[in-house]
């Protein structure tokens, strides 16, 4: 679950990281009142769950409450990489002397937390990695031992800071890792982490992603989810316990098991198509869950055909067929649906489809044949 900047900063502040005073606003009038309360120069920052705000004009500096109100009027409603700006963070200005980069993330290759640091903050870390990879310090942390003092000293030495500012930086590194662990994050990124003219180390931005599987023990964070900003298909899938990720293609994908669904995406691409989603109905899915999954996939207006790829182990082929037929009866879906059904009770499932399915339902014996058929039907405009 991705968090807005102001949410991430609130969490980081609880772990001792220094942030600037800020107020969330949803209207230009609220932005003006926030600027009046904060006083002096403020930054008006779009709150969206994506990057590139600065380049898109989503961050403005205002010298007065009136300027803050005008900036808010321009930014609210703006589209930034497909995300509509509905809220702003009005934040006090800072006297910036240096910009650094600091993050903690899960490194799946090493299966350990990874801390990244660079003296080149304020720009995309990918750009830094391409331009000057030697400027990035990478530290793996043993999750059973934690971040050790010598590792903190190594990063502090790499920062080039000295005196009380160096100590402040070391505390920021330690607090960042504690926050990363404490909220079960998969990513905590501060870019930039700035050194002010007074020598203070401050998190000027915060990008935080919390592991969805841990939200049951972080009820407050789970309650921060912005339903309005969420993709409607992904939100509905989460409500009913389906694993769904929206993509940009036109062939809807359903399968049972993450591995099979990933393979299905590959086969559709091999057949020249573009998957519209990842949707895993899971093992043992019953007719109702199958029907709900099909409704969600078909509700994406970009979908022109649906590829239903099921290998029955725990999931029974006859239950899949009943769910598919129930979904079509309930919703009146007229998109072409290509079914590849194998495994437990597959023969019975295919018999049910042959006897009761409408003309828009097609069956194929192999995964590749089914993928080719789904791609062909999508190219024909869904007919």
Curated annotation (Swiss-Prot):
InterPro entries recorded for this chain? Answer: ATP-grasp, ATP-grasp_succ-CoA_synth-type, ATP_grasp_subdomain_1, Succ-CoA_synthase_bsu_CS, SUCC_ACL_C, Succ_CoA_ligase-like_bsu, Succinyl-CoA_synth-like
BP-aspect Gene Ontology terms: succinyl-CoA metabolic process; tricarboxylic acid cycle
What PROSITE patterns does the record point to?
A: ATP_GRASP, SUCCINYL_COA_LIG_3
Top-level enzyme category: ligase
Cellular component GO terms, alphabetical: cytosol; succinate-CoA ligase complex
Catalysed reaction per UniProt? Answer: succinate + ATP + CoA = succinyl-CoA + ADP + phosphate; GTP + succinate + CoA = succinyl-CoA + GDP + phosphate
Note on how the cofactor is bound? Binds 1 Mg(2+) ion per subunit.
Domain (ATP-grasp) spans 9-236
Q: Which UniProt keywords apply?
A: ATP-binding, Ligase, Magnesium, Metal-binding, Nucleotide-binding, Tricarboxylic acid cycle
The UniProt GO MF terms for this protein read:
ATP binding; magnesium ion binding; succinate-CoA ligase (ADP-forming) activity; succinate-CoA ligase (GDP-forming) activity
Please list the residues that bind Mg(2+): 191, 205
Cofactor(s), names only, from the UniProt record:
Mg(2+)
First and last residue of the signal peptide: none
Chain positions recorded as ATP binding sites: 45, 52-54, 91, 94, 99
Q: How does it assemble?
A: Heterotetramer of two alpha and two beta subunits.
**Member of which family?**
Belongs to the succinate/malate CoA ligase beta subunit family.
Q: What does this protein do?
A: Succinyl-CoA synthetase functions in the citric acid cycle (TCA), coupling the hydrolysis of succinyl-CoA to the synthesis of either ATP or GTP and thus represents the only step of substrate-level phosphorylation in the TCA. The beta subunit provides nucleotide specificity of the enzyme and binds the substrate succinate, while the binding sites for coenzyme A and phosphate are found in the alpha subunit.
Can you say what this protein is called? Succinate--CoA ligase [ADP-forming] subunit beta
Gene assigned in the entry: sucC
């Amino acid at each position: 679950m991705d968090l807005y900047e102001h949410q991430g900063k609130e969490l980081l502040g609880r772990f001792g990281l220094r942030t600037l005073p800020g107020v969330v606003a949803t209207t230009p009038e609220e932005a003006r009142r926030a600027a009046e309360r904060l006083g002096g120069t403020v930054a008006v920052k779009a709150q969206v769950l994506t990057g590139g705000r600065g380049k898109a004009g989503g961050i403005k500096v205002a010298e007065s409450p009136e300027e803050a109100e005008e900036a808010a009027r321009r930014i609210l409603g703006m589209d930034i990489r497909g995300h509509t700006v509905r809220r702003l963070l009005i934040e006090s200005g800072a006297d910036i002397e240096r910009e650094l980069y600091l993050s903690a993330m899960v490194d799946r290759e090493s299966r350990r937390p990874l801390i990244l640091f660079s003296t080149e903050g304020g720009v995309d870390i990918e750009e830094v990695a391409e331009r000057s990879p030697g400027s990035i310090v990478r530290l793996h942390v043993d999750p059973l031992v934690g971040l050790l003092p010598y590792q903190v000293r190594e990063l502090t030495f790499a920062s080039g800071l000295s005196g009380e500012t160096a100590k402040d930086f070391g505390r920021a590194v330690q607090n960042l890792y504690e926050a990363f662990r404490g909220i079960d994050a998969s990513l905590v990124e501060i870019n930039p982490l700035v050194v002010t003219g007074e020598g203070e180390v401050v998190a000027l931005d915060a990008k935080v992603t919390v592991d969805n599987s841990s939200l049951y023990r972080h009820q407050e964070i789970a309650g921060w989810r912005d339903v309005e900003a969420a993709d409607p298909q992904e939100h509905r899938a989460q409500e009913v316990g389906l694993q769904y990720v929206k993509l940009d293609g036109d062939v809807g994908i359903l399968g049972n098991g993450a591995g099979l669904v990933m393979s299905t995406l590959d086969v559709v691409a091999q057949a020249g198509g573009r998957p519209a989603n990842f949707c895993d109905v899971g093992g043992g899915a019953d007719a109702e869950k199958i029907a709900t999954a099909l409704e969600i996939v078909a509700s994406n207006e970009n979908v022109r055909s649906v590829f239903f790829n099921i290998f029955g182990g725990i999931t029974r082929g006859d239950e899949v067929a009943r769910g598919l037929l129930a979904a079509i009866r309930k919703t009146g879906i007229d998109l072409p649906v290509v079914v590849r059904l194998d495994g437990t009770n597959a023969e019975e499932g295919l018999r049910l489809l042959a006897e009761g399915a409408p003309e828009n339902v097609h069956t194929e014996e192999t995964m590749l044949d089914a993928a080719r058929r789904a791609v062909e039907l999508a190219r024909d405009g869904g007919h």
